[in-house]
Amino acid sequence: HRLSSAASDVYKRQLHKKINEVSKKYLEPHGDGYQLHFTSAVCIGPGESKQILHRDRGIWGGYLPRKVEPLMSTIWAITEFTKANGATQVVPGSHKWDKDRIPTEKEIAYAEMKPGSVLLYTGTVLHGGGQNETIDESRTGVFLHYALNWLRQEENQYLSCPPDVAKDLSPEIRSLIGYSKGGYVLGFYSDPHDKTATYESVSPENMFKDHLIDDFSSYQTQQN
């Protein structure tokens, strides 16, 4: 987790043009924008058992109407993905299934891919990490998921990437993380440094402007 504050190659993946075009196509019919939902690097080592098949939309329980697609998930291959070393199991077409339908083995595909490749699937598609049957080969992937900006993020981006870290990122990355407003006032903040209450419904991006905040010491994460 905490990849939003990690490295420049992660930023490039987060802002990848094609990924964001696909995310916009599938998500924006259900809202006026999307945000980074979850970041993680996952390594499946030799002998690891397969993950239970699941839908990522389950993070919000069963409260969202099925017709609403809340999530676009991506897995970037850092190492080669093979069926033998735990390539992700995916069930094509399962986004249209009844939620209780169980796939047969023949209906499960494996996302075998070379390093640098990326798997995309919506939050309604059944999937899960594969079993690593090798004795000396690990499978590593970077997970970057995007969700509608009116839903709570699975990873608390504002703790994983607090303002004193986010100030060094590009405005595009900050906006994707959630340092921005959705719709008219969703996600606004009250500036604790504005003693006169001059500004109302302030966009979080404003906190990175010098005329509002010059010192981020009050936002820094305390070390134990």
Language-model regions: role of each:
Residues 29, 59-64, 130-131:
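Short helix-to-loop capping/linker segments positioned immediately adjacent to catalytic or ligand/cofactor-binding
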Residues 42, 80-81, 124-125:
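Short Ser/Thr-interspersed hydrophobic loop/turn segments at strand-loop and sheet-helix junctions
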Residues 29-39:
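A short coil-to-beta-strand element that immediately follows conserved catalytic motifs
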Residues 1-7, 11:
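Single conserved hydrophobic/aromatic residue that forms the stacking wall/gate
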Residues 101-120, 125, 130-224:
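Conserved double-stranded beta-helix
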Residues 47-113, 140, 151-161:
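Catalytic core of non-heme Fe(II) oxygenases with the double-stranded beta-helix
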Residues 18-26:
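Amphipathic alpha-helical segments that form well-ordered structural scaffolds
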Residues 38-41, 74-76, 142-146:
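A structural signal for short, well-ordered beta-strand segments
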